Design a protein with these regions (language model features):
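Sec-dependent signal peptide recognition
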Residues: 1-8
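Hydrophobic h-region of N-terminal signal peptides that target proteins for export
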Residues: 9-16
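Catalytic glycan-binding domains that act on GlcNAc-containing polysaccharides
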Residues: 16-162
Length: 162
């Protein structure tokens, strides 16, 4: 019985995410996760999307938690129900939008829990918004509204109703 409990404890410890960095400090983020710098630079070079925009989206959407999901709604105040959306991972990409990304880029192995893929997804999405909505790639505020509301929601200015 003790071995069983020990195995369960070790398993749970292995599932913990190490976020021992200050999410408000880009230098600390890259010092703790050096590959992330090259991933965000790759996205910048590929899509023309600033590193600061990528990181601000990821911080706001998932707080750098790779398995982030929206909270579950409560049924009768205590029973976990459905989630508000299918958002998942660093970028909090919805299932349908993630599938669009995979189709458009041919990146069939993309994973929303993978930082490189999440960064590339944000670059792809912002580039699409730049083309469709004519937003400057440095306009973080309006790009975030388009990202959060969807491009159609942005065009309808659905954010004004919130």
């Amino acid at each position: 019985m003790i071995k069983f409990i020990l195995v369960i404890c070790l398993f749970l410890i292995g599932c913990l995410t190490d976020r021992s960095f200050n999410t408000a400090n880009i230098c600390d983020i890259f010092k703790t996760n050096p590959k992330w710098k090259s991933y965000t630079e790759d996205t910048k070079n590929k899509w023309g999307v600033p590193v600061s925009l990528q990181l601000s989206f990821i911080k706001h959407e998932s707080s750098f938690k790779r398995t982030a999901r929206p909270p579950r709604k409560k049924v009768l105040g205590i029973i976990p129900g459905l989630r508000a959306s299918s958002a998942y991972g660093y970028s909090q990409a919805l299932d349908g939008t993630w599938e669009e990304y995979i189709q458009a880029t041919g990146n069939s192995n993309a994973d929303r829990k993978n930082f490189r893929d999440a960064s590339d997804f944000i670059g792809w999405y912002v580039d699409g918004s730049y083309r469709l909505l004519k937003l400057s790639k440095n306009d973080v505020y309006n790009h975030y509204l388009a990202y959060h509301e969807g491009r159609g929601g942005y065009q309808k200015k659905s954010f004004n109703k919130k």
